[in-house]
Amino acid sequence: MHIVVCIKQVPDSAQIRVHPVTNTIMRQGVPTIINPYDLFALEAALALRDQHGGEVTVLTMGPPSAEDSLRKALTFGADRAVLLTDRFFAGSDTLATTYALATAVRKIGETFGAPDIVFTGKQTIDGDTAQVGPGIAKRLGLLQLTYVAKIANVDLAGRSIQVERRSEGGVQVLQTRLPCLITMLEATNEIRRGAMADALRAARAEVVIWSAKDAGVEDISKCGLRGSPTIVKRVFAPSARAEKATMVDFSETAPADALIAEIFKRQPKLEDDLAALARGY
């Protein structure tokens, strides 16, 4: 079984700052992490490999520094890491990103064996579009299962997979045939900690580095800014709203009544709405 996991190196959202003049994200000096949803995808892939055998290849597109995230993925237990890096990819939106990553997945299949499953996180915390996974699936002609919370069963002999997909109405149990692409939500499985042996192996491992040409990209005009029909015009931090807090004296004999009275004082329409609702019953 061969599984490809697409990951992304993103700025730590807890430490992101927005430039006050340019309104762009200030990445200098901000620590980077593996996109959290991608970690759940990686854990799901590693669990399947442990159960069924095979290999897990992690793939990322980014600057040379993204190799750090790939080595972290190797520490978790991935078997192989591929870095897709080239100046032609700079400024890619989701359309250009899916073109480059889909091309790289094809190259991985030609070089290391066709993948049975391609995993991504449901979205990245820096872009929040949730478009890259489905876009890769479309370009590769793969069936896709999105917003998956749990891998329920894999039948390699029957070439099928069953998953639990979270939806607004509850949980859907879906089954499809392999190969397919899966985007993962926060999973119930705890993300494993890499063993010391894995950390040593990751430090010595050779990361496969591909340029656009190495990966087989045929049309550079579909990459980077040239291949991106959308651009981020402005990023800004929402202004903080000052809310006045009222302390309710819970030493009163009826603290709940005092709290409700204060709420109705602030939201008089709420009292009328509740009264109308009560009359309806």
Swiss-Prot record:
Gene3D superfamilies, A to Z: HUPs
GO MF term set: electron transfer activity
Record has Aminoacyl-tRNA synthetase as a keyword: no
Entry-linked Pfam families: ETF
Domain of life: Bacteria
Keyword entries, A-Z: Electron transport, Nitrogen fixation, Transport
SUPFAM superfamilies: Adenine nucleotide alpha hydrolases-like (SSF52402)
Record-annotated disulphide pairs: none
InterPro entries: ET-Flavoprotein_bsu_CS, ETF_a/b_N, ETF_b, ETF_beta_N, Rossmann-like_a/b/a_fold
GO biological process entries: nitrogen fixation
Stored PANTHER family: ELECTRON TRANSFER FLAVOPROTEIN BETA-SUBUNIT, PROTEIN FIXA
Task of the protein: May play a role in a redox process involved in nitrogen fixation.
Family, as annotated: Belongs to the ETF beta-subunit/FixA family.
Subunit comment: FixA and FixB form a heterodimer.
This protein's name: Protein FixA
Organism lineage string: Bacteria, Pseudomonadati, Pseudomonadota, Alphaproteobacteria, Hyphomicrobiales
Gene name per UniProt: fixA
